[in-house]
From Swiss-Prot:
GO molecular function, one term: double-stranded RNA binding
Outcome after substituting W1108R: In MRD56; uncertain significance
Species this chain originates from: Homo sapiens (Human)
Effect listed in the UniProt record for changing K506E: Disrupts spindle localization
UniProt region (Globular terminal domain), positions on chain: 2-479
Upper taxonomic lineage: Eukaryota, Metazoa, Chordata, Craniata, Vertebrata
Protein name as annotated: Clathrin heavy chain 1
Length: 1675
């Protein structure tokens, strides 16, 4: 038997299953302030999110795009606190509002909700409390203690009153995690540092103390071990005994040496301390004694956050895998566990009493019996009273105390017992009775009242009966508390509180006979009866049948009261109340039509007989109500045409309830009946419902009656909202035909939906008196030309003036164009232009007139506009064109007029007068146009002057292009004329730059010589001299030396450098020498002329250090190392030591390099110099000097030199150097190359570097030193990233056994990880398959199952593959594998266990097919397992198809309880085949879901009589009585025939059976049939039949029974009449007392009595004509 556990462990959910990234499940990103919410910060893509998981609805996490450093949810409500930097904010998520915000001066390193409205904030220096209430800011509580400096804060706790505050942090010290706490007293304002890892506060009430004590619990893992401390903080409350301190050891397993406590919660319900450690262990301690109750590991991952679990008074937490786990006390098991497993009965008793826990019943009973046997009755009473769950508070205990006699002068043990019980709480039922009986006998009723008020007694019916004899009112109170309805109602009646009966009965759910009560009340007072009836039906479920209540009203002909009652009772308008609604309306339509009209108008009812009520309404003259109820179109058309009798607004709304076809028919009928009277209402209906009735249908309707007025008003109501072009056109038509010209204008102007061409043509044809609509259409849709032609030809010129003056003056140009086209008079056109002033485009007007060569027509108008001061360019352009054409002094106009458009006018002049075009273009700076006209007309002088004056580089660039054919004549004019004339330096500068930019050096030289050498004002200009030399360098190098010697005011260094760049080295050397720049001169000789000899001579002549340095550098570059070193020494220049070192390295001149570096070291103690010197010593193999040098003071990079020596395989030197700097990693590598493997391993151990271990390991493998290789490999395999490379290295060289040996040894390492177990499994699958199963069974939870799955599949290890699929919960694949490879993988138990867990139910049917093929004898066992999810119909169909139904008969029998049709029919077929009629009959009786008739028809032809009998039975069950009886008669089943005839309740069938028996001369059967079909046979028919066949003897028992029945009925009627009279007399004198058993008299017994004895009655008394008071009756 499994051991009982004192805890209940539960996994609530997996965060990864909710889409939470595992990387975000950690202390810094996940918070849980309570068991209500979990809050996670995530980053999805580039967006930061906060995920909130409501633990009551975990499947629907809330995601919000929030960027924050931290987020914590309020413990109880959807309020979130967010921290970003130093900014803190609190938001209400449900209200979507910000509640508070604050910016801290210091960073908040930790924060936590410590109550529902307070957040604790921890900074590096202090702790603050921030309340959500009001506008308060964070309040500083205390400064952090120095002992917490540098600690990571992991928790903050307070006691219930927030008088004691605790801050907890951890830090790494001496290879262990040390916990530090700061306990702060708010009252005393002092702190105490404590070493501890986890802590909590608790309120605990000790036995004998009046007040609770505040306890502080904390756990610590120190160097000496773990401890749990429980102490009381502060001064104990007055009268309290102080809590004794507790300090107990906390056990940590040997394999968890680095484990330590991380969380603590205390259960207030059970007074149990829950302690959780980093390695996932849970410890339970008793708070009072400190005893360890239980310890176990609940998680393989660290649980990093916890909170109290309120639902179970336990602890809930989240681990790093995302599991949300909870642990709580298992109340049913903890006491037995403490008693039996811990063997601590004292603790068990203490906890059972303290926390009211079950499980210690035997201990309490034993203790009670022992005390009772000792005579210690007071203690025994305490034990019995305090026993948990009231296990000893039994009648037996009371009897035992009653049996003890009271001692004189002492309280009896029984009263002591009751006294203790009363002090503790409420007495139970038996205790209350036993206590009250003597109290009432003593007349101390006031004690009973006191106990009732204090709720000390458990009330019961027996207690009420006991009290009633003393005080009925007090008894009523007891009955009420005990919930005894019949007695309560009886007491209400006895105390005169009848009005409370209904309220009380509804309250407690008690149901008396309400109709009987109502009749009695109605007889006394109809009004009170109405009120009482309303009380009966005022709830959703009436207390009595409303129909019966109405019958009671109608018995007394109370129409008005009945109406009022029904209106109230039927207000909920339920479908089941339809007949009552009809009855209500019918009675009022007949007696009070106005009341019925009001009822119908209120639309209270919808379930009455509408057709019947409609006819009644029409007869009563309520035509509107009749229409509301009519459904037949003929009835509706008959009524609807009488619109003068109907409310128009109602009628319009009524059409909304009709179908489209009916609505159109009704409208047609209304227009046909009286179009004048009904047109308005028809228009209203059409307007409102045009969308449903379709606008086209309505238009056709009005047009069919030629009602354009109706069409106008209808379309007018919808045209503003319609987008249909036809609607707008029809509306325009209708408006025209009804003379609504203004409306035509409006719609033409505002509508965007009509077809303009169609409307234009219609308006032309309509010949309206007002042409404004046509004008609007043509103006809007650009038919202006057509409009002008139409108006002009129809002599409607005034509308042209109206159009351009009032409608759209901007259209004047088009109108003028049209008038010119129709040869209108110029005077008319001029007048028209003058009338329309400035409201049109002059450009367009000029264009229209100019197109027709009539520009002069505008001259007077244009001059008038200029005279008026018009500055519009278009006006001046037109005037300029006219002046140019007429040669009216145009040049003066073009130079002086500032308003015309130069480009337009210039273009106009180009062909007429190029000079005028130049004037216009120059005035407007139209560069391109001016250039083109000058080029075309050879005006180069004008162009050159314009270009010089213009000073535009881009413009110069465009004319100086090589592709320009006019460039040469233009340049000649620039050189000869334009520049000679100018005195402006800027013009010269721009021109020269333009020539430079255009890359015209020869032309530029020509230009510059004219400026510089011809003694002009610009001769001494430095820039021009520079430019002349530079241009000569580029274009004519023969002149350069001449210019250098002739000119003196140029920039020598720049010119020299440019000469160098153009390979004029001698000229550059001459410039440097002329200006004494020797370093540059020697540089030219070295770098450009390349003559080191001349350079050496020049250096000796100058003898300057800088020159020697230049020469040395050149020599070094030429590979003349020795000469270069000599030159550097002469220059006294060690600055180029790097280049010297590199040159020596390249050439191998190490001896020379040593000399140079020794010289350089004297000058400069550079690290590089000393480093290179060491390397040079190593290269020259001067190891003794090298060792002496590195042991002395130096600045060399010895590590770097060692690496270089290592790279160049100088391992002896490298060994010295690495040893000097203690670089054990590289030293180990060096030793490997020297073949010193053991020393290399020692070096690697000192280096403790993965790379080093790997290198040494690989070397050892190559050297076949596998023992050393394994030592190295054990340090590598613990790093998951390195494992694959190591394995590949071994495998590539074929060392499989050694690799497996190493991995097996590594499994025991503390840092063994999943990759090691996984790779070992893969290796087993390849090389040692026989060991794989054992490995997987031991370590399946630690391998990467998907990876091992692939390996097992590749290795064809099918059994192992199934095992892995099972553990990975891929049950579908496991089943498929077993079925595909049954020889290796199939195991019966495993298959049946896994198949129930598959997700794809289709595998069930594959499994069935598999078993049928391979394991047919086990098929039924499989089907039993599959049956809960199996589609039995499909399964049966399958077995039927393969003809294997008999094989699965046990399965079919087991699932027949589902009453599945296919199963039933298959089993029935099997039973028929097996001829098992008993099983078939049993199946038919138990399971009815099959084709009864088909089976019966099949069985009636069966050769066995029992099956034909079953066929008759089935026909009977399907009410085919005649067929059933006929089948019985055919097979001589007389008893069955009589029984079926009796059950049919068919008199004719019974009488036919009687006749058949007589025909067959079965007289005994005739007598038996009379007995069996007694209720169906008519006595007169039986008498006649018996007399005719002379068998009166066989019929005589029947007649005796009939006579007996009639006589008994008469006697009963006589007795009931007498009884009725007696009760009537008694009722008149007796008040109504309810609650007694009621006698409900009926019209007679209605239960048929079996005829065997005594014979039943078949008579029913006729109903009375009038209801008799005091009787209930049924009809």
């Amino acid at each position: 038997m499994a051991q009982i556990l004192p805890i209940r462990f539960q996994e609530h959910l997996q965060l990864q299953n909710l889409g939470i990234n595992p990387a975000n499940i950690g202390f810094s990103t996940l918070t849980m302030e309570s068991d209500k919410f979990i809050c996670i910060r995530e980053k999805v893509g580039e967006q930061a999110q906060v995920v909130i998981i409501d633990m009551n609805d975990p499947s629907n996490p809330i995601r919000r795009p929030i960027s924050a450093d931290s987020a914590i949810m309020n413990p109880a409500s959807k309020v979130i606190a967010l921290k970003a930097g130093k900014t803190l904010q609190i938001f209400n998520i449900e209200m979507k509002s910000k509640m508070k915000a604050h910016t801290m001066t210091d960073d908040v390193t930790f924060w936590k909700w410590i109550s529902l409205n307070t957040v604790a904030l921890v900074t590096d220096n202090a702790v603050y409390h921030w309340s959500m209430e009001g506008e308060s800011q964070p309040v500083k509580m205390f400064d952090r203690h120095s002992s917490l400096a540098g600690c990571q804060i992991i928790n903050y706790r307070t006691d219930a009153k927030q008088k004691w505050l605790l801050l907890t942090g951890i830090s790494a010290q001496q290879n262990r995690v040390v916990g530090a706490m700061q306990l702060y007293s708010v009252d005393r304002k002092v702190s105490q540092p404590i070493e501890g890892h986890a802590a909590s506060f608790a309120q605990f009430k000790m036995e004998g103390n009046a007040e609770e004590s505040t306890l502080f619990c904390f756990a610590v893992r120190g160097q000496a071990g773990g401890k749990l401390h429980i102490i009381e903080v502060g001064t104990p409350p007055t009268g309290n005994q102080p809590f004794p301190k507790k300090a107990v050891d906390v056990f940590f397993p040997p394999e968890a040496q680095n484990d330590f406590p991380v969380a603590m919660q205390i259960s207030e319900k059970h007074d149990v301390v829950f302690l959780i450690t980093k390695y996932g262990y849970i410890h339970l301690y008793d708070l009072e004694t400190g005893t360890c109750i239980y310890m176990n590991r609940i998680s393989g991952e660290t649980i990093f956050v916890t909170a109290p679990h309120e639902a179970t008074a336990g602890i809930i937490g989240v681990n790093r895998k995302g599991q949300v786990l909870s642990v709580c006390v298992e109340e049913e098991n903890i006491i037995p566990y403490i008693t039996n497993v811990l063997q601590n009965p004292d603790l068990a008793l203490r906890m059972a009493v303290r926390n009211n826990l079950a499980g210690a019943e035997e201990l309490f009973a034993r203790k009670f019996n022992a005390l009772f046997a000792q005579g210690n009755y007071s203690e025994a009473a305490k034990v019995a009273a305090n026993a948990p769950k009231g296990i000893l508070r039994t009648p037996d205990t009371i009897r035992r105390f009653q049996s003890v006699p009271a001692q004189p002068g002492q309280t009896s043990p029984l009263l002591q017992y009751f006294g203790i019980l009363l002090d503790q709480g409420q007495l139970n039922k038996y205790e209350s009775l036993e206590l009250c009986r003597p109290v009432l006998q003593q007349g101390r009723k006031q004690l009973l009242e006191k106990w009732l008020k204090e709720d000390k007694l458990e009330c019961s019916e027996e207690l009420g009966d006991l009290v009633k004899s003393v005080d009925p009112t007090l008894a009523l109170s007891v009955y009420l508390r005990a919930n005894v309805p019949n007695k309560v109602i009886q007491c209400f009646a006895e105390t005169g509180q009848v009005q409370k009966i209904v309220l009380y009965a509804k309250k407690v759910g008690y149901t008396p006979d309400w109709i009987f009560l109502l009749r009695n009340v109605m007889r006394i007072s109809p009004d009170q009866g109405q009120q009482f009836a309303q009380m009966l039906v005022q709830d959703e479920e009436p207390l009595a049948d409303i129909t019966q209540i109405v019958d009671v009203f109608m018995e007394y002909n109370l129409i008005q009261q009945c109406t009022a009652f029904l209106l109230d009772a039927l207000k909920n308008n339920r479908p089941s109340e339809g007949p009552l609604q009809t009855r209500l309306l019918e009675m009022n339509l007949m007696h009070a039509p106005q009341v019925a009209d009001a009822i119908l108008g209120n639309q209270m009812f919808t379930h009455y007989d509408r057709a019947h009520i409609a006819q009644l309404c029409e007869k009563a003259g309520l035509l509107q109500r009749a229409l509301e109820h009519f459904t037949d179109l003929y009835d509706i058309k008959r009524a609807v045409v009488h619109t003068h009798l109907l409310n128009p607004e109602w009628l319009v709304n009524y059409f909304g309830s009709l179908s489209v076809e009916d609505s159109l028919e009704c409208l047609r009928a209304m227009l046909s009946a009286n179009i004048r009277q009904n047109l308005q209402i028809c228009v209203q209906v059409a307007s409102k419902y045009h969308e449903q009735l379709s606008t086209q249908s309505l238009i056709e309707l009005f047009e069919s009656f030629k009602s354009f007025e109706g069409l106008f008003y209808f379309l007018g109501s919808i045209v503003n909202f319609s987008q249909d072009p036809d609607v707008h056109f029809k509306y325009i038509q209708a408006a025209c035909k009804t003379g609504q010209i203004k409306e035509v204008e409006r719609i033409c102007r505002e509508s965007n939906c009509y077809d303009p061409e169609r409307v234009k043509n219609f308006l032309k044809e309509a010949k309206l008196t007002d042409q404004l609509p046509l004008i609007i259409v043509c103006d809007r849709f650009d038919f202006v030309h057509d409009l002008v032609l139409y108006l002009y030809r129809n002599n409607l010129q005034k509308y042209i003036e109206i159009y351009v003056q009032k409608v759209n003056p901007s259209r004047l140009p088009v109108v003028i164009g049209g008038l010119l086209d129709v040869d209108c008079s110029e005077d008319v056109i001029k007048n028209l232009i003058l009338v329309v002033r400035g409201q049109f485009s002059t450009d367009e007007l000029v264009a229209e007139v100019e197109k027709r060569n009539r520009l002069k027509l505008l001259l007077p108008w244009l001059e008038a506009r200029i005279h008026e001061g018009c500055e519009e360019p278009a006006t001046h352009n037109a005037l300029a064109k006219i002046y140019i054409d007429s040669n009216n002094n145009p040049e003066r106009f073009l130079r002086e007029n500032p308003y015309y458009d130069s480009r337009v006018v210039g273009k106009y002049c180009e062909k007429r007068d190029p000079h005028l075009a130049c004037v216009a273009y120059e005035r407007g700076q139209c560069d391109l146009e001016l250039i083109n006209v000058c080029n075309e007309n050879s005006l180069f002088k004008s162009l050159s002057r314009y270009l010089v004056r213009r000073k535009d580089p881009e413009l110069w660039g465009s004319v100086l292009l090589e592709s320009n054919p006019y460039r040469r004549p233009l340049i000649d004019q620039v050189v000869q004329t334009a520049l000679s004339e100018t005195q402006d330096p800027e013009e010269v500068s721009v021109t020269v730059k333009a020539f430079m930019t255009a890359d015209l050096p020869n032309e530029l030289i020509e230009l510059l010589e004219k400026i510089v050498l011809d003694n002009s004002v610009f001769s001494e200009h430095r820039n021009l001299q520079n430019l002349l030399i530079l241009t000569a360098i580029k274009a004519d190098r023969t002149r350069v030396m001449e210019y250098i010697n002739r000119l003196d005011n140029y920039d020598a260094p720049d010119i020299a450098n440019i000469a160098i760049s153009n390979e004029l080295f001698e000229e550059a050397f001459a410039i440097f020498r002329k200006f004494d720049v020797n370093t540059s001169a020697v540089q030219v000789l070295i770098e450009h002329i390349g003559n080191l000899d001349r350079a050496y001579e020049f250096a000796e002549r100058c003898n300057e250090p800088a020159v020697w340095s230049q020469l040395a550098k050149a020599q070094l570059q030429k590979g003349m190392v020795k000469e270069a070193i000599d030159s550097y020494i002469k220059a006294d220049d060690p600055s180029s030591y790097m280049e010297v070192v590199q040159a020596a390295n390249t050439s191998g001149n190490w001896e020379e390099l040593v000399k140079y570096l020794q010289m350089a070291r004297k000058k400069a103690r550079e690290s590089y110099v000393e480093t290179e010197l060491i390397f040079a010593l190593a290269k020259t193999n001067r190891l003794a000097e090298l060792e002496e040098f590195i042991n002395g003071p130096n600045n060399a990079h010895i590590q770097q030199v060692g690496d270089r020596c290592y790279d160049e395989k100088m391992y002896d030197a490298a060994k010295l150097l690495y040893n000097n700097v203690s670089n054990f990693g590289r030293l180990a590598s060096t030793l490997v190359h020297l073949g010193e493997y053991q020393a290399a391993v020692d070096g690697a151990r000192k280096a403790n570097s993965t790379r080093t271990w790997k290198e040494v390991c690989f070397a050892c493998v190559d050297g076949k030193e596998f023992r050393l290789a394994q030592m190295c490999g054990l340090h590598i395999v613990v790093h998951a990233d390195e494992l694959e490379e190591l394995i590949n290295y071994y495998q590539d060289r074929g060392y499989f056994e050694e690799l497996i040996t190493m991995l097996e040894a590594a499994l025991g390492l503390e840092r063994a990880h999943m990759g090691m177990f996984t790779e070992l499994a893969i290796l087993y699958s390849k090389f040692k398959p026989q060991k794989m199963r054992e490995h997987l069974e031991l370590f399946w939870s630690r391998v990467n199952i998907p990876k091992v799955l692939r390996a097992a599949e590749q290795a064809h290890l099918w059994a192992e593959l199934v095992f892995l699929y099972d553990k990975y919960e891929e049950y579908d694949n496991a089943i498929i594998t077993m079925m595909n490879h049954p020889t290796d993988a199939w195991k019966e138990g495993q298959f049946k266990d896994i198949i129930t867990k598959v997700a794809n139910v289709e595998l069930y049917y594959r499994a069935i097919q598999f078993y049928l093929e391979f394991k047919p004898l086990l098929l039924n066992d499989l089907l039993m397992v599959l049956s809960p999810r199996l589609d039995h119909t499909r399964a049966v169909n399958y077995f039927s198809k393969v003809k294997q139904l008999p094989l699965v008969k046990p399965y079919l029998r087991s699932v027949q309880n589902h009453n599945n049709k296919s199963v039933n029919e298959s089993l029935n077929n099997l039973f028929i085949t097996e001829e098992d009629y008993q099983a078939l009959r049993t199946s038919i009786d138990a399971y009815d879901n099959f084709d009864n008739i088909s089976l019966a028809q099949r069985l009636e032809k069966h050769e066995l009589i029992e099956f034909r009998r079953i066929a008759a039975y089935l026909f009977k069950g399907n009410n085919r009585w005649k067929q059933s009886v006929e089948l019985c008669k055919k097979d001589s089943l007389y008893k069955d025939a009589m029984q079926y005839a009796s059950e049919s309740k068919d008199t004719e069938l019974a009488e036919e059976l009687l006749q058949w028996f007589l025909q067959e001369e079965k007289r005994e059967c005739f007598g038996a049939c009379l007995f069996t079909c007694y209720d169906l046979l008519r006595p007169d028919v039986v008498l006649e039949t018996a007399w005719r066949h002379n068998i009166m003897d066989f019929a005589m028992p029947y007649f005796i029974q009939v006579m007996k029945e009639y006589l008994t009925k008469v006697d009963k009627l006589d007795a009931s009449e007498s009884l009725r009279k007696e009760e009537e007399q008694a009722t008149e004198t007796q008040p109504i007392v309810y609650g007694q058993p009621q006698l409900m008299l009926t019209a007679g017994p209605s239960v048929a009595v079996p005829p065997q004895a005594p014979f039943g009655y078949g008579y029913t008394a006729p109903p009375y004509g009038q209801p008799q008071p005091g009787f209930g009756y049924s009809m």
